[in-house]
């Protein structure tokens, strides 16, 4: 094939059809074998005669593939990174569960409506990227087996909920579920003790509240809940002492009041802590007290490029931060969202 020959001349493939480069994701202990067939305008995979058992990185991205044969996946006994983003895939082969060494899977930019249940058998998986698809649900038991998963990115889909087993992904550090149709977040979020970044922005009219457990995410540093329909933040967020970046722009937020929000994270935490210590908040605190962890005071910094409203607005993403009082239209906001601007093959926003 002309494209493959060109890749060989540029050093992407050695004469056996493998690359001798090293992938940044892995420890540079052993030479990795990369088979790069990206950007070759393939509608189907050719017959591969080389030993796929030696391949550790397989890149099939940016083609027109509508399917991947079960037989090919089953031969990838040592693959660590599998990249099939930006194709026309409507499903993944069930044999993907055979990839016991797989650490990074990227299926973004396809036409997937679901992921096979066998994906939970990829117990070494550390990163799962499934953005810009047609996903309406994730496997219910996904989190029960993927104990090594550190990053889950499922933005720009049609998800109404995340699986309840999400709370079992105890190694998770980053969860990106923006631009979906989430009605609520799963129970047991407080179990995600290592979670540092949570993005559930742009679920528009569907997401109306955050669970109390959000305030028990002891490692959380970044939280984006912008462009939803949230009127009040849970009092427990006063306990997020490590939180350094926060955005709630585009919500009809009334608690905390906007004048408190504009004073910065310290003021917002103080307000929510005061609420938690009195009235109904006091009873909630007693119920959750065994799970709370005390930290020393954290002084956050402003995010570069953002406007400081008051001297103590550290960490808040304050650009155009205001209560919309129910005026914001999800259809209008979606016109400006990354779903419309950056989706590889969608010219109109999805409807849930």
Curated annotation (Swiss-Prot):
InterPro entries, A to Z: Leu-rich_rpt (IPR001611), Leu-rich_rpt_typical-subtyp (IPR003591), LRR_dom_sf (IPR032675), LRR_domain-containing (IPR050216)
Mutant phenotype after disruption: Late flowering.
Chain positions of LRR repeats: 29-52, 53-75, 77-99, 100-122, 124-146, 147-169, 171-192, 195-217, 218-241, 243-263
Keyword Signal part of the UniProt annotation: no
Region of interest called Disordered, as start-end residue ranges on this chain: 1-25
SMART domains: LRR_BAC, LRR_TYP
Entry keyword set: Leucine-rich repeat, Repeat
Top-level division of the source organism's lineage: Eukaryota
Expressing tissues: Widely expressed but at a lower level in seedlings and stems.
Any single Pfam family the record assigns to this protein: LRR_8
Disulfide pattern: none
UniProt motif GVYW: location: 264-271
GO biological process: intracellular signal transduction
Family statement: Belongs to the SHOC2 family.
Free-text function comment from the UniProt entry: Leucine-rich repeat protein that likely mediates protein interactions, possibly in the context of signal transduction.
Protein name: Plant intracellular Ras-group-related LRR protein 1
Organism annotation: Oryza sativa subsp. japonica (Rice)
Encoding gene per record: IRL1
């Amino acid at each position: 094939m002309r494209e493959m020959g060109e890749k060989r001349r540029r050093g992407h493939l050695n004469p056996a059809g493998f690359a001798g480069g090293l992938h940044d994701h892995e420890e540079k202990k052993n030479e990795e074998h990369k088979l790069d067939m990206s950007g070759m305008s393939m509608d189907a995979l050719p017959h591969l005669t080389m030993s796929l058992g030696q391949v550790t990185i397989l890149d099939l991205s940016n083609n027109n593939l509508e399917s991947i044969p079960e037989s090919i996946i089953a031969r990838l006994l040592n693959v660590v990174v599998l990249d099939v983003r930006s194709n026309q895939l409507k499903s993944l082969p069930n044999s993907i569960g055979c990839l016991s060494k797989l650490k990074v899977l990227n299926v973004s930019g396809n036409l997937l409506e679901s992921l096979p249940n066998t994906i939970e058998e990829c117990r070494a998986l550390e990163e799962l990227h499934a953005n810009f698809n047609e996903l309406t649900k994730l496997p219910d038991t996904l989190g029960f087996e993927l104990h090594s998963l550190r990053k889950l990115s499922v933005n720009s889909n049609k998800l109404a909920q995340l699986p309840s087993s999400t709370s079992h992904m105890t190694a998770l550090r980053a969860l990106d579920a923006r631009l979906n149709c989430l009605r609520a977040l799963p129970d047991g979020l407080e179990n995600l003790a290592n979670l540092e970044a949570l993005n559930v922005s742009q679920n528009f009219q569907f997401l109306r509240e955050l669970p109390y457990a959000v305030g028990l995410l002891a490692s959380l540093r970044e939280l984006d809940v912008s462009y939803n329909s949230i009127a009040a933040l849970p009092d427990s967020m006063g306990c997020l002492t490590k939180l350094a970046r926060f955005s709630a722009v585009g919500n009809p937020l009334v608690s905390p009041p906007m004048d408190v929000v504009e004073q910065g994270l310290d003021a917002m935490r103080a307000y929510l802590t005061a609420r938690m210590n009195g009235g109904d908040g006091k009873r909630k605190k007693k119920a959750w007290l065994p799970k709370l962890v005390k930290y020393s005071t954290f002084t956050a910094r402003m995010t570069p490029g953002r406007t400081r409203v008051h001297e103590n607005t550290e960490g808040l993403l304050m650009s155009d931060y205001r209560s919309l009082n129910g005026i914001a239209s999800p259809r209008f906001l979606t016109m400006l969202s990354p779903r419309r601007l950056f989706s590889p093959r969608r010219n109109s926003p999805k409807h849930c």
